[in-house]
Amino acid sequence: MRHRKSGRQLNRNSSHRQAMFRNMAGSLVRHEIIKTTLPKAKELRRVVEPLITLAKTDSVANRRLAFARTRDNEIVAKLFNELGPRFASRAGGYTRILKCGFRAGDNAPMAYIELVDRAEPKAEAAAE
């Protein structure tokens, strides 16, 4: 029985799931928007939101915790130097999921997951 077991299995073993979400979290922090399937996007929220909350208070211990979860110094630097200060006044809810139709090959529901206060460089350039 799977009573009270949280999280989706996504037809992967635990090490594959952990590696996949570690990579996806890094991509989301790096690019601030990624396109993936809807169930993966909903699970990715559970990985990324605590990372950003951790980055709001900059300390060596928090940087080490973030590195243990992402294994990428570039991602840790962006979390603590850019995203932590950007979301300092926001109490959670750092990501947004936008549904974007279905994938052509297998009709899987697709979604964009993005950071809420994401800067849009194309819109700013067009306005000028």
UniProtKB/Swiss-Prot annotation:
Keywords: Ribonucleoprotein, Ribosomal protein. GO terms for biological process: translation. GO terms for molecular function: structural constituent of ribosome. Pfam families: Ribosomal_L17 (PF01196). PROSITE patterns: RIBOSOMAL_L17 (PS01167). InterPro entries: Ribosomal_bL17, Ribosomal_bL17_CS, Ribosomal_bL17_sf. One of its GO terms (cellular component) is cytosolic large ribosomal subunit. Belongs to the bacterial ribosomal protein bL17 family. Part of the 50S ribosomal subunit. Contacts protein L32. This is Large ribosomal subunit protein bL17. The lineage of its organism: Bacteria, Pseudomonadati, Pseudomonadota, Gammaproteobacteria, Enterobacterales. The gene is rplQ.
